[in-house]
Every structure is written in C-alpha cells, then in structure tokens.
Amino acid sequence: MSLLSATPVVAVIGGGPAGLMAAETLAAAGVPVDLFDAMPSVGRKFLLAGVGGMNITHAEEQSAFRQRYRERESGVSPWLDSFDSNALRAWIHELGIETFVGTSGRVFPADMKAAPLLRAWLHRLREQGVRIHTRSRWLGWDAEGRLRLAIPEGERLLQPQATVLALGGGSWPRLGSDGAWQALLAARGVELRPLEPANCGFEVAGWSDFLKTRYAGAPIKPAALALPGQPPRQGEFVLTDTGIEGSLVYALSAEIRTAIERDGQATLTLDLAPQRDLAELGRALARPRGSQSLANHLRRHAGIDGARAALLRELAPPETFQDMGRLAQACKAVPLTVVRARPLAEAISSAGGVPLEALDDGLMLRQLPGVFCAGEMLDWEAPTGGYLLTACFASGRAAGQGVLRWLAAGGSSA
C-alpha cells in the first residue's frame, strides 16, 4: 500500500448527484477536490432514472413540496432553504439545459434525457478542477484514520482534511449503491438504521395462475388505493407476477411498509371506478342485462374490463357477481392485501441509513469529525416525482457548504 502522490484537501466518495454536487460546491469555492467512485463511470443510477423521461424535480408550491418528506420534513428543509426546486431548475439552465413542467407538475429536461445533463455537469466539474477517479472503491479507514481505496493497481491511502461520503442507499446495487458502507461506519461506532425498500412493489399471498399468465405487466388505471383511516389516492399501478407496483403504490409505500411491520400485512381498499360515485354506478349496473354476458355488462355500464375486470374477479368473493348492488360496492371498495415488500435491490430508493440526528447542521458525523454524509445514505425518504433527486442535490450542496465552514474554522480529519 502507498499514499497517493497528491493527497486531496477534500475527498468525495461517490459519484451520484449528491457527491457531484458536493464536489461542485467545494470546487466553486476554490477547494481542491478528488472524487472517487467504485464503478467504471459516475452517475449510473442517475442515468437509469432518465430512462423513460428524466423527472428532475417538481414545480409544486414549496410548503407542499417539503411535506413530501413526511416525518423528515424538518431535517430536509434546511437543505432546501439554500437549494430548493427553483434553484435546481436555475442551476440546470446554467448548464445549458432547458426544462419544462409537465401536466402533473413534474419537471423534466426539454429533451427528457439525463445523459446531456450529466455530460454538461461533468464538463463543468473538470473545468473547475475536480479530479474524478473511477474504479476506486472505498474500503474504510486504516488504523491511523487514513482512507483506504481499492484501485486497479492495488490499494492506496489518503488523508484528506475532510471527506464527504455520498455512497447511496441499497437499491440497484449493480449500479454502485450496494450499502457496503454500513459495516464500515458501524465499525467506527456510527449507529445506523437498517436499509429498507422505499418506492417499491409489494407482494400478495399469491395470484391465480390465470391472472399471472394473462395480466402480469398490465396497468390498472384509473384506480384509487387507500389504507385504513386515510383518504384514497388516485393514479395507476401495474400487476406483477407477485403483486403490485407502480407510481400509485410507490406513493403509499412508506405507509404500507409501516402497516406490514406492525400487523404482518397491509390491506388496502381498491377503487376500480374512482371517477364515479357508488350510487351512480349502482344504478348503471342495475340496468337489465338481457342476453349479454356479465363481462360485457360490466364493461358497458361500469367501464371495467380487461386487467381491471380480472383483478376484480380475483379479489371479490364469487357471490359478489350474483348481486349488482354488491358488485357496485366491490367496484368501489374491494380489499387488496399485500404481505411483504419486494427486495431492496429492486426498489427505486431506500429508507434507513445514517440518522439525521447523527449529523450536525453541516451534515458532519458527530462521531467522526471531518467526515460528512449526503444523499440517499441518510435516513430520509420521499415519493417519486422529483423529490428524491431534489433532496440528493440539496444535501450534496449542504454537505459541501458544511465542509467549507469546517475548513474555514481550521478543522481537519483525525
């Protein structure tokens, strides 16, 4: 093992949005920065998020925006105070990338792609002097407190004045966020919360072979889902071989996960006709059926067919279909029970990680002076819709600013 010939003032570990933003914040202030990432290139999960349309942030009013972080709103809000969704859009425009607001309020780059944005950003970082080292996996610290890095040539040691860890959560490990950092921080006495899947699909006890064969992958829309005691949310979701996934499910994933942890399962109320009230639907289904099949009657008078009709038959008792009043009620409120989340590796994001209480206002670990954390490795979560990326960018900026204050005060790593 040997020391790198030029030890950086600041080492940033992790090349996702949080790490890159921390590096930019530091470099813009004139601080030499080296960024290390285990993968052959940086921003891999960011690029994956751009498949099908790069939803970068949301145009929602700021107080409502912040409420999306639920019980972590008070912890995330200070990051957003200095870099909110409006600031993020302005920053993107400075990179030469235009944005637009979709009908749902989601904000996208004009070309809907992540790659041009990442290329422009990396060009700026290199112009600012940020040195990016790929295929460089962080292995923790040695006995003298130096950073250990596995690189293609062997192992190298670093002793920067400050370190920013932006290593991601535990979802999509093949793209770099494998959660291996948990053991390294735990070994240094940092208390962590277990990583859990967030924005994830959920499994049912078992679909019928018919439903799996015919309708796995089929969208269920329009639809509304509600947990007990909560108002319904409208949107769409997808049937899978094992259960359900999709934007409507992701929006409820934190509450569903909590219910499963408490009760061993979560029973949602599914509304397959959210745009019609029960009385009107009951009158429509009560019309004489004549010689037409029940399937055609349901399609013509309730607008339910295909995958939605198959799901209704899967979930409702057989006798429901003998009484049009009961059928109308089932269309509006049929129980859908899920029993477990899909594996963390499949989730869009993760909950758990470094508790915000373990960090000071500059996102420095109280247990490890000079070591800062940012991004999804922190214990917060948010629904899809641009909220995840916004907080990753904002936390990276907050960590970078925290390092600047630390250095200005004469701090250095032990």
Where are these regions (language model features)?
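A conserved FAD-binding loop/helix module that cradles the flavin
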Residues: 171-184, 188, 379-411
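Glycine-rich FAD pyrophosphate-binding loop
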Residues: 27-51
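Glycine-rich loop(s) and the adjacent beta-strand/alpha-helix scaffold that form part
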Residues: 162-208
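N-terminal Rossmann-like FAD-binding beta1-loop-alpha1 element of flavoenzymes
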Residues: 8-35, 403-404
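Short beta-strand to alpha-helix junction loop
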Residues: 76-84, 103-123, 172-177, 203-205, ...
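Residue-level recognition of phosphate/Mg2+-coordinating polar/acidic sites
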Residues: 28-29, 41, 62-64, 81, ...
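A conserved short coil-to-beta-strand element within the FAD-binding core of flavoproteins
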Residues: 134-146
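Short hydrophobic core segments
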Residues: 11-13, 36, 138, 157-173, ...
